[in-house]
Amino acid sequence: MATLRVQPEAQAKVDVFREDLCTKTENLLGSYFPKKISELDAFLKEPALNEANLSNLKAPLDIPVPDPVKEKEKGERKKQQEKEDKDEKKKGEDEDKGPPCGPVNCNEKILVLLQRLKPEIKDVIEQLNLVTTWLQLQIPRIEDGNNFGVAVQEKVFELMTSLHTKLEGFHTQISKYFSERGDAVTKAAKQPHVGDYRQLVHELDEAEYRDIRLMVMEIRNAYAVLYDIILKNFEKLKKPRGETKGMIY
């Protein structure tokens, strides 16, 4: 029978790591998770996340609307200049110039909420990773029979994987908001006479506000679901075959 020889000193280090991780995880489940559920539930009840009139979220766009007559004259002068000037390099430099307005800031109300949300996303992903590792360390040696507890472990692991995928997507979702808003602001600055582009900026802010509230709810629910399912099945997760088994080697 093939066996893997492990130095006692190396095994002792692994055992210390495992015991430390198990202690941390059980402390998380016993106190930290209930605390986070309560904190996030309180966050969801704050006025900042319960704005009934979303038009109050509107951020000022310091993009002046041009005078149509002056714009027409400017356009005619530009056409004349392009005919006279055949220097492609100069034309390229002109095209790279920014819009004729000052800097357009982010939506401060949305930014404040995101500054509170992002640490929560980071925290829940780290805690989920810790609990997932704990669960994997409880998996017994693969053998026939008495595998009901192992099946429970697999179901809980599937749930954790699904939660991790969803939570990881929040970072991409936030980045996408800034990218899309930046594009909308750029279009509004380049074509200030088109009201739809201005409105698009406000629509993106409102959509992100709703998404922020949903993300806070999802994080709270992730803590609650993990706490509940592990608490209900703790014995099966800890001792899937009714006794402590070693790690898979």
Swiss-Prot record:
Species of the source: Macaca fascicularis (Crab-eating macaque)
Span list, region Disordered: 60-101
Family: Belongs to the PA28 family.
Composition bias, Basic and acidic residues: 68-98
Subunit structure, as described in the record: Heterodimer of PSME1 and PSME2, which forms a hexameric ring. PSME1 can form homoheptamers.
Protein name: Proteasome activator complex subunit 1
UniProt KW keywords: Proteasome
Source organism, top-level taxon: Eukaryota
UniProt GO BP: regulation of G1/S transition of mitotic cell cycle; regulation of proteasomal protein catabolic process
Annotated GO CC locations: cytoplasm; nucleoplasm; proteasome activator complex
Function: Implicated in immunoproteasome assembly and required for efficient antigen processing. The PA28 activator complex enhances the generation of class I binding peptides by altering the cleavage pattern of the proteasome.
Taxonomy of the source species: Eukaryota, Metazoa, Chordata, Craniata, Vertebrata
Induction: By interferon gamma.
Gene3D superfamilies: Proteasome activator pa28, C-terminal domain, Proteasome activator pa28, N-terminal domain
Molecular-function GO terms, alphabetical: endopeptidase activator activity
